[in-house]
Amino acid sequence: MSEPTPRRPAYARLLDRAVRILAVRDHSEQELRRKLSAPVMGKNGPEEIDATPDDYERVISWCHEHHYLDDNRFVIRFIASRSRKGYGPARIRQELNQKGIARESTEKAMRECDIDWSEMAREQAVRKYGEPLPSTFSEKVKVQRFLLYRGYLMDDIQEIWRNFAD
């Protein structure tokens, strides 16, 4: 009989897992920590990695040093992705907050991104309700509620009707 092969150290398994996770898409540091600490599905069901908190810190710092993990890059790409899907600034900020991104980083990236939120709100309203946009009060309320849900600010929503009246 052959002896079972020894398992790799926890640090090496964590590092391998982190690189595989980050190869798929960018993650925030908090997301990566959460995914690394979750059990891994093995051949015999979920397996815990017996890693110490120091192992996790070493993996996170290695990912930062080798530019696999960069919260600023993540924020910029996340804003671009969510805005392309039609979400507004309030919703994007809230989602970034849930992902553990500091408010300062979010605000800096929002200022740097070149997005006309009122035009985006108008595009979403036209896509959902058609051209011309509704003009009765009850229909305007529906459009407003939809855009607020999507994360647009009231100023951007009101801008739609100011421009529409011109």
Swiss-Prot record:
Record-linked InterPro entries: RecX_HTH_1st, RecX_HTH_2nd, RecX_HTH_3rd, Regulatory_RecX, WH-like_DNA-bd_sf
GO CC field: cytoplasm
Disulfide bonds: none
Keywords: Cytoplasm
Signal peptide: none
Gene Ontology BP, a term: regulation of DNA repair
Name of one Pfam family that matches: RecX_HTH3
Subcellular location per the Swiss-Prot or TrEMBL entry: Cytoplasm
Functional note: Modulates RecA activity.
Family assignment from sequence similarity: Belongs to the RecX family.
Protein name as annotated: Regulatory protein RecX
Lineage: Bacteria, Pseudomonadati, Pseudomonadota, Gammaproteobacteria, Enterobacterales
